[in-house]
Amino acid sequence: MKAPVRVAVTGAAGQIGYALLFRIASGEMLGKDQPVILQLLELSNEKAQAALKGVMMELEDCAFPLLAGMVGTDDAEVAFKDIDVALLVGARPRGPGMERKDLLLENAKIFTAQGAALNKVAKRDVKVLVVGNPANTNAYIAMKSAPDLNPNNFTAMLRLDHNRALSQLALKLGKPVGGIEKLVVWGNHSPTMYPDYRFATSDGASIGDAINDQEWNASTFIPTVGKRGAAIIEARGLSSAASAANAAIDHVRDWVLGSNGKWVTMGVPSDGSYGISEGVIFGFPVTTENGQYSLVKDLPIDDFSQKYIDKTLAELEEERSGVSHLLG
């Protein structure tokens, strides 16, 4: 049996956490031969800690063979001690009458503290996925608050947008989703992100040629993917938790175990590729192998695409400037 991998999850008793933990403990994220120790962080209030205790009791009651241990805490330094993987799910949700900039500042406090705790106690090669919104900028804040860790350790979740775009293309084509490759989602995890199927194929055939409908792309496909989260809240009365948890598992699984040459979308620190400001955490096409990701480089960007990429980059730069005074 392999040595256990330590996985931290913040916001562990929340909706996404609840949809995530049992799948991690069953081996869906890191492999069916990989034991895990779950290190679970929740808020220090009595209600959150009681809920966390209940979730841990349920995890015990599943008797997962791969669950080698659990820690439940309200202290980030305890939760992040010696971890290999961190899923930063917990974030301050937007309340009634709350401006986006207020939300940014509230979350900046959380992710500054968590970045500092990771810097202090996590393994030096820890893989960090930020799920809590605004995910790209929260990941940027955590990265900047952990100066002793490699910036490439920090990623934001664009995989939910990627998966949503895949399913919309499959519906349009009337083909199985599993045959679609080389889809890209550029930018911020927000309604400005740009799902781009110019390079995508379905069973090896060009999707752009098959659809050949720029009107559908601009007026249906892009807005449907961008507003899908809001549509789910409207339909369900709650935000998308199970699909977000599923995307987090996909993201980490591919990062750790490899994407087998397939393109996936990850929010990663820009190296200046595609004209994206260096350091901004931006959705790019990547391939993953041996625990490392590599950007897919030198894709042609047409005028239509450039307009969308510029818009989502402008939003990210505005978010970055809104929190830069907190990061020294």
Swiss-Prot record:
Binding, substrate: 94, 100, 133, 164
CDD domains: MDH_chloroplast-like
Keyword Lipid metabolism among UniProt keywords: no
Binding site for NAD(+): 11-17, 107, 114, 131-133
UniProt GO BP: malate metabolic process; tricarboxylic acid cycle
TM regions (residue ranges): none
Active-site residues, as the UniProt record annotates them: 189 (proton acceptor)
UniProt superkingdom: Bacteria
Primary enzyme class: oxidoreductase
A molecular-function term among this protein's GO annotations: L-malate dehydrogenase (NAD+) activity
Catalytic activity: (S)-malate + NAD(+) = oxaloacetate + NADH + H(+)
NCBIfam families: MalateDH-SF1 (TIGR01759), PRK05442.1 (NF003916)
Name used for this protein in its record: Malate dehydrogenase
